[in-house]
Amino acid sequence: MLGAALRRCAVAATAWAGPRGLLHSAPTPGPAAAIHSVRCYSHGSSETDEEFDARWVTXFNKPDIDAWELRKGINTLVTYDLVPEPKIIDAALRACRRLNDFASTVRILEAVKDKAGPHKEIYPYVIQELRPTLNELGISTPEELGLDKV
């Protein structure tokens, strides 16, 4: 599928080339103009929110997850343009606890606060939803540790 998309992009790119291989600022009308409308992006299936959440919860709930996989998962999750659901964060915090990685728990909570951005109501909601887990695992929030004042 990727090969076909790359071929379409190559065809679209050659449609702009003139007789000497130079790029022209405006295409000439004709059959090549139809090729121009091809967009070069993936047409793969999209993942529902429930599938996305289940995939991340399953990954963090792996009993044999190691520190590298945990950090890789956290880094990947942070790159998305979203604030993870509390159930995903819960699974990540439990994975941190299984690995005795307190620093990652603080990093996760700081990342959630950062991802919430100007929406001040999101972070308190997430902490409220995670409060039972935080108490059960003995995890302090960055605010409780005084890290928000640094």
From Swiss-Prot:
GO terms for molecular function: metal ion binding. One of its GO terms (biological process) is mitochondrial electron transport, cytochrome c to oxygen. The modification Phosphothreonine is found at residue 141. It comes from Saimiri sciureus. PANTHER family: CYTOCHROME C OXIDASE POLYPEPTIDE, CYTOCHROME C OXIDASE SUBUNIT 5A, MITOCHONDRIAL. Its main location: mitochondrion. Belongs to the cytochrome c oxidase subunit 5A family. Disulfide bonds: none annotated. The keyword Amino-acid biosynthesis does not apply. The modification N6-acetyllysine is found at residues 87, 113. Residues 1-41 form a transit peptide. In response to mitochondrial stress, the precursor protein is ubiquitinated by the SIFI complex in the cytoplasm before mitochondrial import, leading to its degradation. Within the SIFI complex, UBR4 initiates ubiquitin chain that are further elongated or branched by KCMF1. Component of the cytochrome c oxidase (complex IV, CIV), a multisubunit enzyme composed of 14 subunits. The complex is composed of a catalytic core of 3 subunits MT-CO1, MT-CO2 and MT-CO3, encoded in the mitochondrial DNA, and 11 supernumerary subunits COX4I, COX5A, COX5B, COX6A, COX6B, COX6C, COX7A, COX7B, COX7C, COX8 and NDUFA4, which are encoded in the nuclear genome. A motif (SIFI-degron) lies at residues 2-17. This is Cytochrome c oxidase subunit 5A, mitochondrial. It is a peripheral membrane protein.
